[in-house]
């Protein structure tokens, strides 16, 4: 896996709702902190809440949410952070557009697909959204009455059978060259100041 000497990186965690994206992001963030790397989590739900103009759940709204998250991730990566985006981002074309923008800006982009079967997501259902969608109380629910387009060639696939901690450790090993680069650049920036 070739890494060049650019600041920052974007790890884009995608998967069905309740696939484990936020939990993996939190576990990975802790591991990165433990080795002195600067990381920031951008959670799709939190980003939606923070918007001044709320978005709905049409394809256009979802694509706009992905676009906005991508722009914010690039802004954070400018400071040399490893930005972990945990977001359903159900449409390939929107993820592909963010990938191209991030790479064109000179940052690493690593798509991580949490391959969790919908049956497991329905069992987890921490917000009760699958239950509402299955009862006809909620429309536009990704995986039930709205599509989720799995990545065709993600850099990393995490299977649902892994614990959040083991999945984070696996991902940490995979991005280790980037972590070394990030912490080295942080030391160099400190010396320059």
Residue ranges and their predicted role:
Residues 8-12, 38, 82-84:
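Residue-level preference for the first positions of well-ordered beta-strands
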Residues 10, 41, 109-111, 155-157:
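Conserved beta-strand scaffold positions in the cores of enzyme catalytic domains, especially
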Residues 61, 65-69, 94, 137-140, ...:
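Helical mechanochemical/support elements of P-loop NTPase systems and associated helical scaffolds
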Residues 3-30:
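Walker A (P-loop) phosphate-binding motif
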Residues 115-118, 123-172, 176-193:
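Small-molecule kinase domains that catalyze NTP-dependent phosphoryl transfer to phosphate-bearing small molecules
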Residues 50, 54-56, 73-134, 140, ...:
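ATP-dependent NMP and nucleoside kinases share a basic, alpha-helical "lid"
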Residues 19, 26-78:
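Conserved substrate/cofactor phosphate-moiety recognition/catalytic segment
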């Amino acid at each position: 896996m070739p890494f060049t000497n650019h600041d920052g990186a974007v790890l884009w965690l995608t998967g069905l709702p309740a696939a484990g994206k936020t939990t993996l992001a939190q576990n990975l963030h802790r591991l990165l902190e433990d080795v002195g790397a600067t990381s920031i989590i951008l959670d799709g739900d939190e980003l939606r809440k923070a918007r001044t103009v709320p978005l709905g759940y049409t394809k256009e709204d979802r694509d706009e949410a992905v676009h906005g998250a991508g722009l914010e991730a690039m802004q954070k990566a400018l400071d040399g952070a490893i930005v972990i985006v945990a977001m359903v981002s159900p449409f390939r074309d929107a993820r592909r557009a963010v990938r191209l923008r991030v790479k064109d800006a000179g940052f690493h982009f690593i798509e991580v697909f949490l391959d969790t079967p919908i049956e497991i997501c329905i069992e987890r259902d921490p917000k009760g959204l699958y239950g509402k969608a299955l009862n006809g109380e909620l429309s536009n629910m990704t995986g039930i009455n709205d599509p989720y387009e799995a990545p065709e060639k993600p850099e990393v696939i995490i299977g649902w059978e892994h614990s959040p901690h083991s999945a984070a450790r696996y991902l940490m090993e995979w991005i280790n060259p980037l972590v070394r680069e990030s912490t080295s650049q942080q030391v160099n920036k400190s010396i320059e100041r």
